[in-house]
Amino acid sequence: MRRFSWLWLWLAVACGTSSSGVKPVSSPDPQAPCVGGHLTWNLQISDQRAERSDTPRVVGLIRDSLSRSLPGCRWSDSAQSENGTITIELHRFGTTTDGAVWEASAEWDVWARNPAGQTLTEFEATGEASRPNYRGENSERVAMQHALEEAMGKTLAGLRALSTGG
């Protein structure tokens, strides 16, 4: 029976979600508290990954990161026709390991559209990180945090480049 308890413990650790313990990114720019000359945006985040067991957590990380980094923006979940829409389509957010190194990746596509539905910008944001499996550290979480920070940095740069005339 003791042998089976170790098996269950190993399975629980191996099947844990890579988003666990990852914190939202906060990178506000006092010169650009919101983007595109608008204060309110509709925000739609969809998870297109094959494995979606941690969807609420990952979507929350992305939403919180945008809110903290663009504190002048108000975000609406409902598609209000008078607001532009920022859409994020999540493709990868996870880690793999060979036992010695953790590989983390975050990847999503971003679109910003004006209230008429015209595309203002579209781009891909990716982040990748490798981290040796150090003892006494959650190397999986550290690698995933770095990948999120890189992908969110690209997202913010792309959104902040929006013209204020849109």
PLM segments and residue spans:
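Flexible, charged surface loops at secondary-structure boundaries
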Residues: 34-36, 78-82
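A structural "domain/chain start" motif
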Residues: 15-68, 160-166
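Sec-dependent bacterial lipoprotein signal peptides
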Residues: 1-13
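Surface-exposed short loop/turn segments
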Residues: 17-21, 73, 80-122, 126-138, ...
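Short glycine-aromatic motifs
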Residues: 75-77, 161
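Short secondary-structure boundary motifs at beta->alpha junctions and helix caps
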Residues: 50-56, 114-165
